[in-house]
Amino acid sequence: YAAIIIQDYGNIMMESVAIGALDQGKLEETMDLYQRSFVILKKFLTVKPDREAPWCKRKFDSERFQWELNFFLKEYLENVAGIVLSESEALTFKKESVALSNFLASNSDHFVHRDFHSRNVMVKNEKLAVIDFQDARYGPVSYDLVSLCFDSYIPFEIKDRVTLVNRGIEHISNGNTGLKEDLENQWRAMLLQRQLKAIGSFGYLSVRKNRGNYLKYVKPALETLDPSIVFDERWPFISSKIIELIATSTK
């Protein structure tokens, strides 16, 4: 026998609570809300593998990350922005995509929600609950932290997003030096990859799927790709030139 326990958590998303507080100038109240969500992230790291669990049969490996970067190239840069890379640029993009993807996949053995952002966290009686976790899988330890702190739905200033990430790292690592180093070494590259994938998704949902104006989130996503944060000499074309091309398409 099996039982399914269902609880109605209402219709108040973390997004609306956070935006409401920011609109009233209550930045610290919003930051505290995110601090509480870090408790959930920390719990994610305690999820034990089970070979029968669906999430254990999926993983963010190098091939998947490369596929997502190519998805961005096709569904946004080419299909929305109308920008086609030259042959040499395409080769550089491919080479750097492999390097970036290999780096992220080298430490990709943690439970990740995959869509952990302010629209998938519900708020009821000051308590938080996670929804939409059917795409969970193995992935980089920084994936969900970056997803939450840099989602395009909340109008944080970039300095506040960085503050959130640093607070999240401290809470999640909780004195674990190795875990803290992994998070600090990885989150910028993770931000770059994930936001390019998100921009690709905005193009895909708006143009191919006609699901509404998701293109309005491209600029907020672009603003999170601050050069002082994401530029990396290991993949300079992707972390600089590609971002410049996105910027020209949004003017």
How should these model regions be labeled?
Residues 1-2, 110, 124-129, 243-251:
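Conserved NTP-binding catalytic cores of kinases and kinase-like/nucleotidyltransferase enzymes
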Residues 1-61, 65-67, 71, 78-81:
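ATP-binding pocket architecture of kinase catalytic cores
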Residues 30, 34-37, 65, 90-93, ...:
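Hydrophobic packing residues in well-ordered alpha-helices of helical domains and bundles
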Residues 33, 64, 108, 113, ...:
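Secondary-structure capping and boundary motifs in well-ordered enzyme cores
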Residues 44-45, 98-145, 155-156:
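Active-site acidic catalytic loop and adjacent metal/ATP-binding pocket
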Residues 49-58, 63-64, 68-111, 179-181:
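An alpha-helical support segment within catalytic cores of ATP-dependent transferases
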Residues 70-80, 141-177, 189-209, 221-228:
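Active-site activation/catalytic loop segments of kinase-like enzymes and analogous catalytic loops
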Residues 200-251:
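ATP/Mg2+ or Mg2+-diphosphate-binding catalytic cores
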